[in-house]
Amino acid sequence: MGISERLTAAGLSAGEAERKTGLFEAAEQRLALLTRRACKSAPRWFVPGRIEVFGKHTDYAGGRSLLCAVERGICVVAQPRSDRVVRIADAILGLETSPTLSDEQESPENGSWRAYPAAVARRIARNFPGVLAGADIAIASDLPRSAGLS
């Protein structure tokens, strides 16, 4: 079963599932450039976008939120690494960053795209100190920027 069929079986409309195939191909190509090897068998995930209908900025403070998923989202293709580096490349925006799994790393400039992956790497290192392996990750997203979707 191909990626489009799996996405349709998981609930995406046929048209959106087909569009995600192109995003997965873009992410796969970007990962191949990043790792300098073919990535046809690399694991892949689709993360649907969400709209916060009610409760914005309350969920992380213990409050309640009402969310709904949308058919736009982020396509992820990844492979493990043997070191603590997490290389992340955005196939659409052409951005790349390589934080390490360490809670002592310096933060990129505030507001930079690179700050988000760095914060995740720091949090993983802090919460899961036994994690010793990083990953090469390529993403491709059709979430509109600055549209209130996450």
Label every model-predicted segment:
Residues M1-S150:
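ATP-binding N-lobe of GHMP and related small-molecule kinases
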